[in-house]
From Swiss-Prot:
Binding site for Zn(2+) 2: 216, 219, 255, 310
InterPro entries: ADP-glucose_phosphorylase (IPR053177), GalP_UDPtransf1 (IPR001937), GalP_Utransf_C (IPR005850), GalP_Utransf_N (IPR005849), HIT-like_sf (IPR036265)
Catalytic center residues: 186 (tele-amp-histidine intermediate)
Natural source organism: Arabidopsis thaliana
Pfam families registered for this protein in UniProt: GalP_UDP_tr_C, GalP_UDP_transf
Entry binding sites for Zn(2+) 1: 63, 66, 133, 184
Reported function: Catalyzes the conversion of ADP-glucose and inorganic phosphate (Pi) into glucose-1-phosphate and ADP. Does not possess galactose-1-phosphate uridylyltransferase activity.
Protein name: ADP-glucose phosphorylase
Cofactor: Zn(2+)
Classification of source organism: Eukaryota, Viridiplantae, Streptophyta, Embryophyta, Tracheophyta
GO molecular function: ADP binding; nucleotidyltransferase activity; ribose-5-phosphate adenylyltransferase activity; UDP-glucose:hexose-1-phosphate uridylyltransferase activity; zinc ion binding
PANTHER family (alphabetical): ADP-GLUCOSE PHOSPHORYLASE (PTHR42763:SF2)
């Protein structure tokens, strides 16, 4: 990876207008993707605001995720606390799953190098993050968010017992334009029989960087110019070649390739930093819809086999759409440099 350039090096110091900042292409070794930074196409970093309305909250009486309406949901997998009618969170099957958990016996057919179809076996679950309809994830305290993260871990460990599953994606869609069909705060997990191509590309990119430098590029991503905040065990950064404006990554300080190795103490610590980032995003960007994704490693590869990669949590505020150029090339245009994002977000005060 090319060494991150500072604002002063690219003619975009604090005193320069956006129009005077030169465009720049950066390649991200993690995603293996080129990004065009073109500040002249946009406004000042501090002027970014969401114009997308959150999806309207239905009345609690019509929401099956609210406490007391459990019978309207798909089957429950577990709740926290266990067997408690006054639950704090529930993990349930998705009522409209993208994959079927009932096809496992058919999924044992061997996949060959020429296979173009395999049976659609997998798991698609929903994590209901609060019993109260009006509470969003950023309203929950760090311990409560830690409980949600540990619920992800517990469910990953359960699903990992199925030999046909190779990768599990944890993700959250907050707001209608971010893909949420329910306004009650929730996240989702999808367990796949294949390793998705973006995951393979991420592993290849981080491996190439490691072989070239002897270092993990995600460990290297924590340069001070890109750091927003940090906790005891995690650091939040605006990544060097951010695909999206105001994209944020939360990275463990210790090298770790699999999210489900997270312990209880680190879960609470991560919960605090995730809460802080969501609160800062909401304040600075006018409470935009957002997605977060946990990027981890395939289940069947051990920690010792992956000295070159690192799990992380990616937050993407929905501030701009994807056009024909991005779809056609896989190369994205970002109107704000991550150094500027980091500076703006560091200075956001919640008091």
């Amino acid at each position: 990876m090319t060494s991150p350039s500072h604002a002063s090096d690219r003619g975009g110091g604090d005193g320069d207008s956006v129009e005077n900042q030169s465009p720049e292409l950066r390649k991200d070794p993690v995603t293996n993707r080129w990004v065009i930074f073109s500040p002249a196409r946009a406004k000042r970093p501090t002027d970014f605001k969401s114009k997308s309305p959150q999806n309207p909250n239905p009345k609690p009486s019509s929401c099956p995720f609210c406490i007391g309406r459990e019978q309207e949901c798909a089957p429950e997998l577990f709740r926290v606390p266990d067997h408690d009618p006054n639950w704090k969170l529930r993990v349930i099957e998705n009522l409209y799953p993208a994959l079927s958990r009932n096809l496992e016996t058919q999924s044992t057919q061997p996949e060959t190098g020429t296979s173009r179809t395999i049976v659609g076996f997998g798991f698609h679950d929903v994590v209901i993050e609060s019993p109260v309809h009006s509470i969003q994830l950023s309203d929950i305290d760090p311990v409560g968010i830690g409980d949600i993260l540990i619920a992800y871990k517990k469910r990953i460990n359960q699903i990992a017992q199925h030999d046909s599953i190779n990768y599990i994606q944890v993700f959250k869609n907050q707001g209608a334009s971010a893909g949420a069909s329910m306004s009650h705060s929730h996240s989702q997990m999808m367990a796949l029989p294949v390793v998705p191509p973006t995951v393979s590309s991420r592993l290849d990119g981080t491996k190439d960087y490691f072989e070239e430098t002897g270092k993990c590029c995600l460990c290297e991503a924590k340069s001070k110019h890109f750091v927003i905040d940090e906790s005891s065990h995690f650091v939040s950064v605006a990544p060097f070649a951010a695909t999206y404006p105001f994209e944020i990554w939360i990275i463990p300080k210790d090298h770790s390739s699999h999210f489900h190795h997270l312990d209880d103490v680190k879960a609470v610590d991560l919960g605090g930093l995730l809460k802080l980032m969501l609160q800062k995003i909401a304040k600075q960007l006018n409470d935009p819809p957002y997605n977060y994704m946990i990027h981890t490693s395939p289940l069947k590869v051990t920690e010792s086999q992956l000295p070159y990669t690192h799990w992380f949590l990616q937050i993407v505020p929905q501030l701009s759409g994807v056009g024909g150029f991005e779809i056609g090339t896989g190369c994205y245009i970002n109107p704000v440099f991550p150094e500027d994002v980091a500076k703006v977000m560091r200075e956001v005060s919640l008091t």
